[in-house]
Design a protein with these regions (language model features):
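Long, hydrophobic N-terminal alpha-helical segment
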Residues: 8-49
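Conserved short beta-strand elements that form part of the metal-binding/catalytic scaffold
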Residues: 38-84, 124-148
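Vicinal oxygen chelate
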Residues: 2-11, 15-23, 54-59, 73-74, 79-150, ...
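N-terminal hydrophobic or amphipathic segments with adjacent small-residue motifs
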Residues: 13, 31, 44, 81-83, ...
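Acidic/proline-rich low-complexity IDRs
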Residues: 4, 24, 37, 69, ...
Length: 150
């Protein structure tokens, strides 16, 4: 068991970000900037997921854990449904991985349900998949393999 845990630990490299669902992205960016001094380091629209998002940096270390603000492009998007059901707040925690294919294969072998059959494009050229909340104590867990240049 210890060797299995050690091999899994080597696949996970950091807490990548905490995702927060918001109704108004511009308003949330301003609040996090004014309140905590967080700076936007990346912003994009992901039409496939129906979301407009911004990554905010904490401190000077670009590789440190970031805050991801997520606003829906339409009410029926995953973030739109989350806001309708739960209101604004923490929507996910994301772990940075070195090899998302190896991680998903290992998790599936252990009986963990993932939302996608194969990793999909994520923020800033990353590849992502999600562990189903039923398998993670009610938490939506995102797995993020950063883009090669990150």
């Amino acid at each position: 068991m210890r060797s299995t845990l050690a091999s899994m630990a080597s696949l996970f490299t950091a807490v990548d970000h905490v995702g927060i669902a918001v109704a108004d992205l511009d308003e949330a960016i301003a609040w996090y900037g004014d309140t905590f001094g967080l700076a936007v380091v990346h912003e994009e629209v992901n039409a496939e997921q129906g979301v407009r998002e911004a990554m905010l940096q904490v401190g000077d270390d670009r590789s440190a854990t970031q805050i991801q603000l997520l606003a829906p492009l339409r009410p029926d998007s995953p973030i739109g449904r989350f806001l309708e059901r739960s209101g604004p707040g923490i929507q996910q925690i994301a772990y940075r991985v070195g090899d998302i294919d190896a991680v998903t294969e290992t998790l599936r072998r252990r009986g963990t349900n993932l939302l996608y059959e194969v990793a999909r494009p994520g923020t800033a050229g990353s590849r992502v998949n999600f562990i189903h909340p039923r398998d993670a104590g009610g938490v939506l867990v995102e797995l993020v393999e950063p883009a090669p240049s990150s």
